[in-house]
Amino acid sequence: MDKIKNKIQSIRRKPLPDHLKDPIMNLPDGFRNWAVAFIVCNFNVDVGPEIEILYPPNVAFSTSDLTAICFNSFPEQQNTETAEDLAFNFTVTNNSPDIKLNSPNSPHGNADLFFASCVFRQEFDDTMKRSFNQRSMVLISHHNFTSFNNRILQVMTESGVISDPTTLEGAHAQMNNWLPPSIGRHDLPFLGRILTLDIAPHPSFPLQGLAGSVPLVAEPHPSIYAYEPVGSWDNIMNFMPCITDLYVLYEKLVLCESVIVVAKSPQLASEAVSSLLDIIRPVPYAGVVKPYMTMQADFRSIGIDGGTPRPFIIGITNPFLLKRIVAAAERTQGTRPHILYLQNFDGPVPTRRHHSLHHKSSRNVLLDLPGGGIEVHTPSKRYLKSDSATVNQIESILKLDSQTSSLGPLIRRHFAELTAQFIAPINRYLATSNVVSPGGHQRYASFSIPEFLASVGKYGTSVKLRGQSSMQRHKSRDGLYAAFCASENFYSWLDMKISLENEASAGLLGSPTGSKTGR
């Protein structure tokens, strides 16, 4: 590890080409409102990941942050025959106090985390020891505009060269002229095209980026929504153990419990994490989110190796890392995280999980990875009942031979409706205790879980609950809502609700008068 850190430090001191030494910084420095830096990483067979280009070159990353970015920008397991790029995302804790972040408008970004979008490419090269080279281009930002940042990297790398200094310089120069991000629509010129970005008032607005059921007139520059999920359920569902696992995962996440997504590639892992968090919106997941982690990651952020225990959702590809995280979580949190294995299976995706490993349609098996995996434990408690009509629709679409794009909208709309039904009784209860202060701000009386459960018992909920009898269903209902109200998610949702209501009453959420453009 010390050898690699020294290598990173030496690369940072290595002379840059003249045209990259002192980039012309247009004033104001608009790039810093959107991002921190571009980094090109190269996998050196002798020492591991190393930094090839840091642009702008004067960004004061700490050695520990550069090391974390380098390691996370490469797959831990990679097929040497892979010809297509991998696009994935990860986050690292900001341990670079000398980096000055900037964002004058809401959203202001995150001062504690760096959000990384990455394109990994593997190319044949007979001059290399392993006959191919591996490079990654990474965009580091303090804004979690994952889909938008992925699009920026796609435009920059589609020419066929992943480390072209001229492209880096041109991208930086154009972003330098963009107006700062703010709520609403932005039309942003970028390398010969217009990127249209829509920024919602809060990351947890549901159904971002989903087209309406009635097609509108085609826009010349289709919008990218800042917080829309990356990936698609049309792809992810083919790797699921069963369809009804969607409800298990939904329940785990809405109650702010821990989930580990295990996949063969960082792209599938990070896309699944993004898509899973989307289905519980507008409830913000209050745990730690790590779309992709490697063996060299900082585990204190998820309560391991000395950190404060926190719920988490993480994506990994390393079975040895899985065993380490599960053992540590069981030791510090007292419970095993739910494990979702995403892998190729024979036959169609079953509707529900078969508990026998020997059943002909069972997908309840260990992940097909070197070192094996850990057997999945069926959750001992479940409150929500699967919707049979939706499960049957998903099953029918999955059985079609042709490629489809209808699963994503179906799953996203169904779970958005389920979440709306779930939080409706809470909104109803809060409305009875709503007080407007003299300054016009919303204020709620102290929240009493027993009083709220009595309200749900009186007025009911539209959510379908498990149980053969009404008494069992009432028990499931009370257990579900009591668990939610005691979770971190409840407080993150309530904070979002109050903040948006106050901003709306102050006229800060009005419709924008037009698109913002680059200068």
Pin down the residues of each PLM region:
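Acidic, Ser/Thr/Pro/Gly-enriched alpha-helical scaffold modules and adjacent low-complexity linkers
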Residues: D2-R519
